[in-house]
Amino acid sequence: MSETIIVPHTPAPRADLTEAKRLMELGMHLVALKPLTKQPAGNEWNAPANRVTAIDPAATGYGILLAVNNVGSIDPDNWQQAVKGMAALGFDLDSIMDAGVRTKSTRPGSGGRSAFQVEGELRHLCFKTKQHGVVLELRATSPNLQDALPGVLYEDKTGKLCTQTYAGDKRWSVSSDMPQLPDDFFNWWEKCCTDLEFFRDQQEKFSAAIGGQGQLAVSGGKSGTELAYDARGVRGRFNKATSVESVLDRHGYLYDS
């Protein structure tokens, strides 16, 4: 008589949708993702009419729109090369990412992401080479950018199942409660967005540091050249830190207290 072998049933892994539910209830614009990917689902996925209003318990994850929620993120696709490239530009990428809402991925080689509130003239920038492909993205402003939320389940290029989780104590929230970028990095990112020649120079230095041939930007800012004026939001940090009275005092004006 043959012995019956009982194989224990292993339940399929499920996405953790806790954060998606919390952020939806905060009023943030979320988007549905294609099953087991980090790609948005459907046509016009970023339209207001298609924002998520209920969490599907069978979903494998949700994304958060960056521009409409006034947030942005740093996305190192190749962690080791991104660290090396940013070091050549004078920045400690690990410290900068620690300042934001940081997430980590189980995908090998991923540097995770770090999210911040967005102000000024920040926009989407990319550092890539012919040899390495995309190494680092600075993601902001474009209506076509979304970040997968912690808890997502997705397959990498090999079919391996991966997930993302928080990497520290900070959590996604409404923009006003999100961390600000460190001042020096904010100023540098903004200059890259408004001064094309500066940005191309930074791309070349980044690429040289990792032994690659850089694929350089062909336009910068909204005009493609250095801005000759202070655009909306550029003085935001100054205004927050400086009172009207102190400015008047500095220039010898009188005012009613």
Model regions and ranges:
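Conserved phosphate/metal-binding and DNA-contacting active-site motifs used
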Residues: 1-257
